[in-house]
Amino acid sequence: IREQVMGQLRRRGAVVGLSGGIDSSVVSALCVRALGADRVHGLFMPEHHTSEDALRLGSKLAQTLGISTTLEDIAPVLHGLGCYRRQDDAVRTAVPDFGPGWKCKLVLPSILESNRLNVTQLTVQAPSGQTQTVRLSSTAYLQMVAATNFKQRVRKMTEYYHADRLNYAVAGTPNLLEYDQGFFVKQGDGAADFKPIAHLYKTQVYQLAEYLGVPEEIRQRAPTTDTFSMPQTQEEFYFAL
């Protein structure tokens, strides 16, 4: 990391987007080990669907590591781009009643629970708490994914703004499994100046987290996409059989 950032890239430090998850936590801890806490800057980039745990655990990590942070609310930018409107329009093609107070997520059921072709489905939750799962048309599904991809791309744009103003490099947080299976957004979380854990499987990332002293609450947290208004695991969205 030190050779890449200071030698090859000629930058003074590293910027890391903090999600409260295991990957960004390990990358932050590695950067602190390599560059020093005073040369690592963490970014919180919440929007309307960001969980409270993401900010709380990200703040806990930053305090543990002793790094500086900046909070950037990206919701206004996403509103301007039509992210939420485009997503809701796609949902309403399958659930016309979807509106304020409703929540949703995309899920990929386990093939072990079905005797038919496994396709991504939409789960919605009404304000009453009642849930239903329905099929989306391919057009609506692609529009929903395209709309939510705004989030990763706006976050990366924000990371590069802070990297440029500080003369820092942007640290990527995807692990080997995500890169191998294509679980990242082009020019979003897949973009970075250097990628410290891109050669490590998730199990190795967890082992490294314990060695580096990442808070146990973060290590015990189930991996989540933190993309939709309903809680969603990575297995539900992408890694299901």
Which residues does each PLM region occupy?
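ATP-dependent adenylation/nucleotidyltransferase module used to activate substrates
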Residues: I1-P174
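Mid-to-C-terminal catalytic subdomains of enzymes
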Residues: G172-L241
